[in-house]
Amino acid sequence: MKLLFIWLIRGYRMFISPLFLPTCRFQPTCSMYAIEAIERFGVLRGSWMATRRILRCHPFHPGGYDPVPEVVEKVKEE
């Protein structure tokens, strides 16, 4: 399953992304972030992290360097 998602993202990068101007505000790009997050954390958590990152990638966000975290911090319940 992991390889399927990575293959789909790479297909997007190869065939769809070149049709648009580069607009990603982050480094690494959102697609590279998604691939790394899925490789490191699996399909569910990695896809969730990539979705949150893509939702932050808009003209009103400053962007910048935002790597995939080494470990995902769990939210503490009070």
From Swiss-Prot:
List the Pfam families: YidD
| Entry GO CC | plasma membrane
Report the membrane topology from the UniProt record. Peripheral membrane protein
Q: Which InterPro entries match?
A: Membr_insert_effic_factor_YidD
Q: Which domain of life is it from?
A: Bacteria
- Where does the record place it? Cell inner membrane
What keywords are annotated for this sequence in UniProt?
Cell inner membrane, Cell membrane, Membrane
UniProt cross-references to HAMAP family, sorted A to Z: UPF0161_YidD
What does this protein do, in the record's words? Could be involved in insertion of integral membrane proteins into the membrane.
Stated family: Belongs to the UPF0161 family.
NCBIfam families named among the record's database cross-references: membrane protein insertion efficiency factor YidD
Q: What protein am I looking at?
A: Putative membrane protein insertion efficiency factor
Q: Which organism is it from?
A: Nostoc punctiforme (strain ATCC 29133 / PCC 73102)
